[in-house]
Amino acid sequence: MDKKQKISFEGKLHIIAAVVLILSSVMIWMGYGQDIEYHAERIVAIAQEMKIHPGIYRIYTTNSGGYGYASPLFYGDIFMYPYAFLVSVGVDIAIAFRLFLASIMIASYVSMYLCVKSVWGKKTAVLAAYLYAFSPILLADIFIRFAVGEALAFVFLPIVLLGFYRIVIEPKKPSTDWIFLSIGMSGLIFSHIISTVLTVILLILLCIVYIKRIWKNKKTIGYMIAAAGLTVLITAYFTLPMLEQMATTQLFVTDRQTSNLAGNVAPVIGLFFGSEYLSLLNVVIEKITGVADFFVTSWFPGAFGYLIIWILAVRFWKKGIVKNRKADHLLGFSVLYLAISMVPFIQPLLEPFVGFIKIAWRNLTFYILFASLCAAILLVKLKEENKRKAYRTGLLLATFGTLVSFGGLTMITIHNGMYPFETLSSHSIGAGEYLTAAVDNYDYAKERGDVALCEDNDKVTFTFHRDQGYSELEFDNLEGKATFEVPVYMYRGYVVQNEETGTFYTPELSKNGLVEFTVDDVSSGTLQIYYKGTMIQHCSVWISFVTVVVLIILGIWQRKPGKAEKKK
């Protein structure tokens, strides 16, 4: 009688992960997350643009009650397009958003698994992916904060790390693995600029640590330059228009002090419990003592410390239960990023350089990247050496941290209730970071409404109305000249055109941050105001498109049987 084939432990972890990920697509809770309204409205705005015309959208023309908002120029949205398409064909935004968040978790798991597998094998890969994708940090980003950009960064950080590893630590001759570095960085740029800048800082730090290896193998420098150049080409359609806009327009986000790193560190208790548990403890203390708000603190993620405590114990308890040099390097980076996220006196030193990140515990993303990989390597080592007690303790602690994080999520959801997607408004533009600095009032569009002004000619008559994707101003009885201010937020790339004559008028930034233009050649007419884009925007699309097409062709060519045989 044949013995039944047992499923390996790694296989069981795969099954558990698959079940959790599948359930996530249906059961993602929708509480009042910090950024849920903003990102849900972004998807809705893209869907509305899709109904008007196909293409790459630089302005959400329906945002802010039709005033338009340039979020896509500064915050990549390409990964939202598939889910926006679902909304455009009738899928409910709540369902589309759930699918988006679930797909981020799936992609994070798969990305970590494939990247680690290519270097350390299946056993390490499945453990690293498990610890990474179900880490309290990613759970907080997806389920509590709804920080889509930071969550997407989890997908691409392993690819960046793999690219650096293949270039510097274990280079091949000849090698095209530097492309991984470019793909990872490109994905980060499209996902979240703050995470991109922090990753660049990480790469600089890695180069300093491994400077001897880089100096010994001069080709490494060439590979890095090639990766940087390819990244510029792939992301040109996004980065060049963004830089153009920033060079010509003063924005709300660059005109005001927005950072306070020292006030946004993760406290020590965050190693074990999130702020929601302190809120629960406050309720208990108030019931017993009558003292309200015994613990006063801003929100912070929690339960991310169990893993690092186990790693430190495994490495240093009784001179180390297990040893691994590469794991020690990863541990060093884990501790560094944990310190940056939690030690208040470090923040004033960092403020002048990275104050733009606003929240010190954003660095926990990098902490969990290194900690999950370090833990996976040590777990495999422990299993190989048959040290089962330490092995099981590590997995239990990591899983316990995840359960604690889920518990905090449940408390927040019960307290806040479900987010009513039906109340989404076109005025949901986050903190309004990408308004021009001239717009001093976040609610200006809502308060002013669809009102056009002309202050230098009291005889001209005019009416203003909006259509799909553009606005119109009809005027009559114009003698001499008149300067009109229309209710459209001004960004470089807007066009004002006379429907009858085809004449173009130069749009300028008004004192209120709106589109303003002067007419002095006709007495009446109909003017269209729409976003045409700039030459840089149009050319950059072709640069990125051609680059991606060439990469695909080269990839197919490299996989040809004849080419593969020659390599052998």
Spans of features found by a protein language model:
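Membrane-embedded transmembrane-helix bundle of lipid-linked glycan/lipid transferases
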Residues: 1-417, 529-530, 536-568
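Generic detector of short, locally flexible boundary/turn motifs and exposed helical patches
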Residues: 9, 48, 61-62, 128-129, ...
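Membrane-interface segments at or immediately adjacent to transmembrane helices
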Residues: 415-468
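Active-site-proximal, structured, solvent-exposed surfaces of multi-pass membrane proteins
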Residues: 3-7, 446-568
